[in-house]
Amino acid sequence: MIKQRTLKQSIKVTGVGLHSGEKVTLTLRPAMPNTGVVYYRTDLNPTVAFPADPNSVRDTMLCTALINEQGVRISTVEHLNAALAGLGIDNIIIEVDAPEIPIMDGSASPFIYLLLDAGIEEQNAAKKFIRIKEYVRVEDGDKWAEFKPYNGFRLDFTIDFDHPAIGKDVRNYEMNFSAQAFVHQISRARTFGFMKDIEYLQSQGLVLGGSLDNAIVLDDYRILNEDGLRFKDELVRHKMLDAIGDLYMAGYNIIGDFKAYKSGHGLNNKLLRAVLANQEAWEFVTFEDKEQVPQGYVAPAQVLI
């Protein structure tokens, strides 16, 4: 049987909030089978819980934010969510003493190290997957994202920025998902932004924690980071990272073929909602026999950094 996974022990880290610029303490705790992914704002009294749910994603400007019925939010969850998807963690309690998850270095890599340091253990309950059964597509102008059936999790993402530093040869990335592929090919890709946009946003009191330490920054002509890029196509790899995190907002790893053109947090969420709203388009599956599970989902906890 392919089993659910959680952490072996709790672990804590301190970082900076991307939007507030303030110190944030993040604590990750084990959870019982069938708990799912649950975020908690511990700075509020009483503590407010945000179960991962695509219908709770009510703001996708600049990041993915969960907002409850009372208007309370927790922001910038997508990179941590991507790390959970990458390692196949089904059940976890995530506590944060601020309105946002710390940005760390702008990628999912610090969260991967944190989760592996805590340790991952299997639980005595069958792991559920969402299997795509029918073609589903959403569009927004010239942007689009789609799912179709596939026995695995395949991703194909294309960006299109008119910028001298983003050539046509680095605008597309394709990957057959596995824990190893995610850790080595995707998790280290950092978020990015354009200097003119960052200056405007900071003048509006936003992205106050943004810096060259946690983002790739481009001016009109070049990349400003002294150390350059981690991959020549790091920007499109990061957009794939975002998509993996956004699609894991359902709380289950997906079996299907995902393809997107110029998609972002909003369209990723719209696609996930469209899939789940159509009962004919998907189904829950479990695997009693490890021989039957798609190759990319075999033993995702066994990752070599």
Swiss-Prot record:
- Cofactors: Zn(2+)
- How is this protein annotated for GO cellular component? membrane
Its Enzyme Commission number? 3.5.1.108
Q: Which GO terms describe its molecular function?
A: metal ion binding; UDP-3-O-acyl-N-acetylglucosamine deacetylase activity
InterPro entries xrefs: Ribosomal_Su5_D2-typ_SF, UDP-acyl_GlcNac_deAcase, UDP-acyl_GlcNac_deAcase_C, UDP-acyl_N-AcGlcN_deAcase_N
Determine the domain of life of the protein's source.
Answer: Bacteria
Name the pathway: Glycolipid biosynthesis; lipid IV(A) biosynthesis; lipid IV(A) from (3R)-3-hydroxytetradecanoyl-[acyl-carrier-protein] and UDP-N-acetyl-alpha-D-glucosamine: step 2/6
| Name of the protein in question | UDP-3-O-acyl-N-acetylglucosamine deacetylase
Which GO biological process entries does UniProt record here? lipid A biosynthetic process
> What is annotated as the active site?
H265
PANTHER family annotated for this entry? UDP-3-O-ACYL-N-ACETYLGLUCOSAMINE DEACETYLASE 1, MITOCHONDRIAL-RELATED
Enzyme class, one word?
hydrolase
Quickly give the catalysed reaction: a UDP-3-O-[(3R)-3-hydroxyacyl]-N-acetyl-alpha-D-glucosamine + H2O = a UDP-3-O-[(3R)-3-hydroxyacyl]-alpha-D-glucosamine + acetate
Which family does the record assign? Belongs to the LpxC family.
The family database entries (HAMAP family) matched by this protein are listed as: LpxC
| Residue sites binding Zn(2+) per the record | H79, H238, D242
Supply the alphabetized keyword list.
Hydrolase, Lipid A biosynthesis, Lipid biosynthesis, Lipid metabolism, Metal-binding, Zinc
Main role? Answer: Catalyzes the hydrolysis of UDP-3-O-myristoyl-N-acetylglucosamine to form UDP-3-O-myristoylglucosamine and acetate, the committed step in lipid A biosynthesis.
